[in-house]
Swiss-Prot record:
<keyword id="KW-0813">Transport</keyword>
<dbReference type="GO" id="GO:0015288">
    <property type="term" value="F:porin activity"/>
</dbReference>
<keyword id="KW-1134">Transmembrane beta strand</keyword>
<comment type="function">
    <text>Serves as a slightly cation selective porin.</text>
</comment>
<comment type="similarity">
    <text>Belongs to the Gram-negative porin family.</text>
</comment>
<keyword id="KW-0812">Transmembrane</keyword>
<keyword id="KW-0998">Cell outer membrane</keyword>
<feature type="signal peptide">
    <location>
        <begin position="1"/>
        <end position="19"/>
    </location>
</feature>
<dbReference type="InterPro" id="IPR002299">
    <property type="entry name" value="Porin_Neis"/>
</dbReference>
<keyword id="KW-0472">Membrane</keyword>
<keyword id="KW-0626">Porin</keyword>
<comment type="subunit">
    <text>Homotrimer.</text>
</comment>
<keyword id="KW-0406">Ion transport</keyword>
<protein>
    <recommendedName>
        <fullName>Major outer membrane protein P.IB</fullName>
    </recommendedName>
</protein>
<dbReference type="GO" id="GO:0034220">
    <property type="term" value="P:monoatomic ion transmembrane transport"/>
</dbReference>
<dbReference type="GO" id="GO:0046930">
    <property type="term" value="C:pore complex"/>
</dbReference>
<keyword id="KW-0732">Signal</keyword>
Length: 331
């Protein structure tokens, strides 16, 4: 009897040690097909098509916390991509951090979602293709090696500030500053996210200074209905062209409604013509994505979507269409 009790106690020790550690993740994959046509001077100059089995953003993570007393907790998370196609490698390549949480809010350091990325509910699509999600407006979203503070919620209002150091931004990029707020009242919500960088290297021949971005999202979200609209504005100075002024404004909207196990969804995004040295650019675009999810259970869902994107107008434009089906399981 005594030996059995000792054996049972020893067997329970690893379980007790892991009690505050959570394993979680999502496996999602599917088949996507696309066709892109480029027009120049009214003539078709290129046509590209493709169909393939793709990973839709699978991930696996570990997270936990320790009670330090007096309402203070240590928190941590290690999350990484987990492509079923075997194309991902490394640890902590998604949101991964260590920090403290208490009545003062939450303070974390590591690879963290930018404040702007946390306003990304406007793009809820699971896709690999840029044509099956409103990815144009989502391009500035990122995960940054940074320090971030999130305040506690007061009467539905909370705020965040974030700082990414110069040495973590890359050789030709400066430090960046980020801030935002969230307001919730019943199902209604308002979100703001913004960022500023002194200088950024876009590519070898394009450098910009005084880059700033602002996004405002508002909508309604409950168990059945989700409706949101967003407006985003970017502004910068182009170094190679005598610090000319560059800016673009984009808008997007998403509507979804749950009918039993089925959730149909539609998104629309529009990019207005950008300003480049006081001249209009042909970088305007329109994008539409429609689709639906069917829930087999709380964890497993089937996905289907179709998308259309047009950049430019008239004789010079780029038009793409795409479709996809997939399966998603959460654990």
């Amino acid at each position: 009897m005594k030996k059995s009790l000792i054996a049972l106690t020893l067997a329970a020790l690893p379980v007790a040690a892991m009690a505050d550690v959570t394993l979680y993740g999502t496996i999602k994959a599917g088949v996507e097909t696309s066709r892109s046509v480029e027009h120049n001077g009214g003539q078709v100059v290129s046509v590209e098509t493709g169909t393939g089995i793709v990973d839709l953003g699978s991930k696996i993570g570990f997270k936990g916390q320790e009670d330090l007393g007096n309402g203070l907790k240590a928190i941590w998370q290690v999350e990484q991509k987990a492509s079923i196609a075997g194309t991902d490698s490394g640890w902590g390549n998604r949101q991964s951090f260590i920090g403290l949480k208490g009545g003062f809010g939450k303070l974390r350091v590591g690879r963290l979602n930018s404040v702007l990325k946390d306003t990304g509910d406007i793009n809820p699509w699971d896709s690999k293709s840029d044509y099956l999600g409103v990815n144009k407006i989502a391009e500035p979203e990122a995960r940054l090696i940074s320090v971030r503070y999130d305040s506690p919620e007061f009467a539905g209002l909370s705020g965040s500030v974030q700082y990414a150091l110069n040495d973590n931004a890359g050789k030709y990029n400066s430090e960046s500053y980020h801030a935002g707020f969230n307001y919730k009242n019943g199902g209604f919500f308002v979100q703001y996210g913004g960022a500023y960088k002194r200088h950024v290297r876009v590519d070898e021949n394009v450098n910009i200074e005084k880059y700033q971005i602002h996004r405002l999202v508002s909508g309604y979200d409950n168990d059945a209905l989700h409706a949101s609209v967003a407006v985003q504005q970017q502004d910068a100075k182009l170094v190679e062209d005598n610090y000319s002024h560059n800016s673009q404004t984009e808008v997007a909207a998403t509507l979804a409604y749950r009918f039993g196990n089925v959730t149909p969804r539609v998104s629309y995004a529009h990019g207005f013509k950008g300003s480049f040295d006081d001249a209009d650019l042909s970088n305007d675009y329109d994008q539409v994505v429609v689709g639906a999810e069917y829930d087999f259970s709380k964890r497993t869902s089937a996905l289907v979507s179709a998308g259309w994107l047009q950049e430019g107008k008239g004789e010079n434009k780029f038009v793409s269409t795409a479709g996809g089906v997939g399966l998603r399981h959460k654990f």
